[in-house]
């Protein structure tokens, strides 16, 4: 039976049954064959030298394609397992995967785990296996054969139970692994790899399952790829908010309490408090009414909103109160804000009605997905909802967008882009059923962007079921795109909760609900800022804005304490380092803690009513009059936060008085 193969250019050719991707590639050109590593048939990766199963659309995957790198790393994970089995015959295996930047394999040993010190030995064994260049043989096992092959491995047996029949695998010498992924046709190209680290991971990501040991590595087609990867990892480590958070004592996670439940230390709590006060003041000034709503709610609320039907896997189990009442930790704040809207009869004169809250939420995140402050189980969202008439959408959208960009400016966030998401015009039946509302609202959002003369990407088919949206994507410290802010129109929740307002005509009308997040959750935003600033927070955000160091406590401490008092009165965050340590040590420690200003006071400064100031990152110090330094610092803080409450010169008295 012939195979009808359609190529990316639309050409269709027939090939005999049993033809491989390799045979087709070699028939196209030798240069392509040298780079090819796999195929993609109707969107699914297929092995390079196995018979093509059926007719379809075929793409040749090469070393230049992302899929090619995935195949390389899947092969590296397989060889890692083979090396581990050779070194530790008693080892059990979970699953191995290629990742965005490498690969891993989950393992378990009864007789002691593999440590990071063992990785050079394991890598040497991998390199020896690769050097032998033994054939990677595809194998097909019946379920019974697979059970026999993995009879001593409890985790592989679970995978076999969940798999179909027959089961695909690969054989390398005496080593056989249950492997439905595509591997390289041979090991000759697997030359540039490195094992990186060891960490714990629950089996299948469930905390109720055994903790396995995850061995991480990476692989590239060239040595340069490995070198560039090492540089990126070093840079990532220097920006990693988890490392910086530990070094600057911002937050910690206690396993006795639970993963994904961070404790905010005084330094981190100060940063968070400054941001929270800032954002609340910004929103109130922009017409929002700030509220507090319960973190618990009756489960029926989330059934009405649809969260229980569509997001149940992300919600914690309900709490049965024993009297028929079921309470739920809220996964989102919008149903609570709807209750506030619905608490009164609303008039068109009240619209737009803007409600905002720093609302605590809970998400049922698997332990394997948790990461520092970026992925947590308890979070506080800078959340807001506006209720508008349909003809107010465009102006309100612009108002929200201006607020977002104003906040970005204060935090010096300059690298961002806009993505406007519409419904799919060819598949409208999967969206909320109101063509006129969709047409008008999408036109309004586009009109608002054009009015503000902003560049944006239009993404058809990416809108939510219930309305179009705008995502604002910022660049992380490592140059990756991350959605920071969202403006989302919602036609569905007003219907579900029967929201109305009385119009000019005296009749009831349905409002449009606009969800908007300015900076997302406090946890994720502070993680982002920590990495962007590399821990060197701008003065207005820094937990300690200045440290004062007397040269001699007996002679200079009284003067230093007077300076401290004036700075505290001015609303600044300042500490005195009067420990019995060497001056150089104190200054170095202040720099290590990334405190914006280190202020030293000795005889000259005392006599001149002055201070010697060293800015973080500078090598030199400058002498300034004490009053002028404090005024300049107050002005700097005011400039970052635009709070306007203290004018330079108002906060200080003559320090020599």
UniProtKB/Swiss-Prot annotation:
Residues 240-538 are annotated as: Catalytic. Its EC number is 6.1.1.3. It comes from the Bacteria. Binds 1 zinc ion per subunit. Residues 1-62 form the TGS domain. InterPro entries: aa-tRNA-synt_IIb (IPR002314), aa-tRNA-synth_II (IPR006195), aa-tRNA-synth_II/BPL/LPL (IPR045864), Anticodon-bd (IPR004154), Anticodon-bd_dom_sf (IPR036621), Beta-grasp_dom_sf (IPR012675), TGS (IPR004095), TGS-like (IPR012676). Zn(2+) binds at residues 334, 385, 515. GO terms for molecular function: ATP binding; catalytic activity, acting on a protein; metal ion binding; threonine-tRNA ligase activity; transferase activity; tRNA binding. Signal peptide: none annotated. The keyword tRNA-binding applies. Keywords: Aminoacyl-tRNA synthetase, ATP-binding, Cytoplasm, Ligase, Metal-binding, Nucleotide-binding, Protein biosynthesis, RNA-binding, tRNA-binding, Zinc. It catalyses: tRNA(Thr) + L-threonine + ATP = L-threonyl-tRNA(Thr) + AMP + diphosphate + H(+). One of its GO terms (biological process) is threonyl-tRNA aminoacylation. It is found in: Cytoplasm. Its cofactor is Zn(2+). GO terms for cellular component: cytoplasm. Belongs to the class-II aminoacyl-tRNA synthetase family. Catalyzes the attachment of threonine to tRNA(Thr) in a two-step reaction: L-threonine is first activated by ATP to form Thr-AMP and then transferred to the acceptor end of tRNA(Thr). Also edits incorrectly charged L-seryl-tRNA(Thr). Homodimer. This is Threonine--tRNA ligase.
